[in-house]
Amino acid sequence: MSLPDLPFNPAHCLINGTWRAPLDGQTLALIDPSNGSELTQIARGQSRDIDASVEAAQSALNGEWGSKTALERGRILTRIGQLVLEHVDLLAELEAHDVGKPLTQARADAIALARYMEFYGGSADKIHGETIPYLGGYTVYTLREPHGVTGHIVPWNYPMQIIGRSVGAA
């Protein structure tokens, strides 16, 4: 079993909008769990690659991304969801190969990723600091604390769903 043709090099890291080799050049084998065969080599990023990613993300947050309105950011997330749906078959095939799950389940995970992006895209300009009332005798308030740049560790068995839940919300 082999991977379909990809529009990027899986042995590269996506940093600051550019696919590039890991700084130390290391890769690791992506193994098909259904039969133990090597599907491809993928980037084995190290701390310097993470540092470059964080620096690029912080620069975007302090620049163009951070200056976008909530409505604009929401539209971008919604567009990501649309793109996922446009490529759902490819993403499902990749997910099935990567984690060894049935294609129907992998497809459902890709659709869930799209739906998370649509949900967070739609809610981006709906958060206004309102506090939901609670029981009498309690003081409740809303404190907005932006996270800034965040890192996400994604488990091997549900990568698309976890990306949707965590990256979409961030």
Give the residues covered by each predicted segment.
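Hydrophobic face of amphipathic alpha-helices that form TPR/SEL1-like repeat modules
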Residues: 1-34
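Short glycine- and Lys/Arg-enriched binding-loop motifs that mark or flank ligand-binding interfaces
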Residues: 13, 21, 96, 118, ...
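A short local loop/turn or secondary-structure capping micro-motif enriched for an aromatic residue
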Residues: 29-30, 47-50, 160
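Conserved strand-loop elements at the edges of beta-sheets that form or border functional pockets
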Residues: 32, 44, 144
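Glycine-rich loop-to-alpha-helix module at the N-terminal edge of alpha/beta enzyme cores
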Residues: 37-127
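Conserved small-residue-rich beta-alpha loop and adjacent elements
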Residues: 130-170
